[in-house]
Amino acid sequence: EIGSGLVGSEMCIRDRCYDQWEALLRPTTRALVVTGASNVTGNGTDLARAADFAHRHSLLFIVDAAQTAGAQPIDVQRLGIDALCFTGHKALLGPQGTGGAYVRPSLRVAPLLVGGSGVHSFDETHPLQMPTALEAGTLNVHGLAGLCAGVRWLLEQGVENLAAREAALARLFYEQVRTAPGVTVYGDMAMQSRAPIVALNIAQEDSARVADILWEDYGICVRAGAHCAPLMHKALGTVEQGVVRFSFSHFNTEQEVQQAAQAVCALAREILCE
């Protein structure tokens, strides 16, 4: 049963993080919680390796799939995932304000929010059965209808097909900017399982200024700053500068990707000459 308690966090980069987990175990450790892929660098987690660690140490295995749900196939039963949380507005193509969670049927979860008794109107306590136990209040039905449409389209197209296209576009962009003078790229592009993200900086220029120029002069929309991931930026040494994040979609074209890469290279030359 999952209830309340203290949570410890640890940031690690690349494969060496798996070797650190053993040392982080405490007598009170109850779960291993991992992100499917970083929203900053795109680096992915080897879920099979993480699952093996969790199972060997009798830990609950919980996955944050905000970046990977809809972008990568995830077999929760094969991996033995106990709980998986996802947002609807990213790769699942749903509206903002939608999302959900998979919870292993035999796992009891104490809800954070309660209210109402569902179809059992005369019960004086919140229902315990799933999924009602975690669905207090009125659901965002309109948003969920949009999410359902997005999921249906993804299944028709094939998640693997779309993921391969996104990975190819991210790789194309990376290959064109990685050797440009003044450009620093973060993340391990050699990973097989990663999000279609390329994060970079140009010299010591503030990432917000780079993003503004890309939008105003080139019509390219990126996200700059900390991306709600302070521990990652501490690990990368980019707390003050932030990073410029390019996120690629299967709706992008190769021409758009090449134009973006050319804009980065041109902007890097301008900044280095200032």
Please tell me what each predicted stretch does.
Residues 1-8, 12-13:
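Single conserved hydrophobic/aromatic residue that forms the stacking wall/gate
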Residues 79-123:
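Active-site PLP attachment segment
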Residues 15-66, 70:
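Active-site phosphate-binding strand-loop segment of PLP-dependent enzymes
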Residues 142-143, 147-194, 201, 213:
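Conserved PLP-dependent catalytic core of the aminotransferase class-I/II
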Residues 128-141:
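A short glycine-threonine-serine/GTX helix/turn-capping micro-motif
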Residues 23, 216-217, 221, 233-274:
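PLP-dependent enzyme catalytic core of the Aspartate aminotransferase-like
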Residues 178, 182-247:
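Conserved C-terminal alpha-helix-loop-beta "cap" of PLP-dependent enzymes
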